[in-house]
Amino acid sequence: MTTPTTLSGAILDPMLRADPVGPRITYYDDATGERIELSAVTLANWAAKTGNLLRDELAAGPASRVAILLPAHWQTAAVLFGVWWIGAQAILDDSPADVALCTADRLAEADAVVNSAAVAGEVAVLSLDPFGRPATGLPVGVTDYATAVRVHGDQIVPEHNPGPVLAGRSVEQILRDCAASAAARGLTAADRVLSTASWAGPDELVDGLLAILAAGASLVQVANPDPAMLQRRIATEKVTRVL
């Protein structure tokens, strides 16, 4: 069996084979009462649509640096796997980028990173609305992710020669990092992990998302956590590990 070329293929394809419809990411926001559950199929479809948007509309590819100015959120996971389907590199800091995906409150940061590159890049804003409503009041030239992504296909041709994935690391290096992170915590495919951790840096992203999914486990990600709800959520979501 050949190893998938992209990080998205290496992580998503085994999940799709093992259990395409079971929950892989369950997202809560205790401030709004939001709960969203994604299966492997749904996550892969959103990732493919995002990759097609990046490739076809925002001119991104395997040499591209894509700034991810987003919180730990189910849509962020889809965006990241979309970036990696096309072989581009996800940038989590304020270094120069060719494309930036951000929330509306981080537009100034996005403008700064794409305008510090040799050629001014593209910016897309995510509303992160659970019903897919668009971001409003955007400046001219800024793409609304929710509006743009829905017209793109949910299948994608993966990049055969991807560039660095994250922090200059290759697909193989990130997979080794994932394996080490999972082994250090004893994670297995039987685990359901509850986390309130951020994905702000490469190591946090590996520990808080990628290592969990690469191990075949599932993630319950909670934003604005209410401590009073923790024990009940552990029981109802059948959580086996808490980060």
Swiss-Prot record:
NCBIfam families: TIGR03089 family protein (TIGR03089)
UniProt-recorded name of the protein: TIGR03089 family protein
Family: Belongs to the TIGR03089 family.
Organism: Mycobacterium tuberculosis (strain ATCC 25618 / H37Rv)
Superkingdom: Bacteria
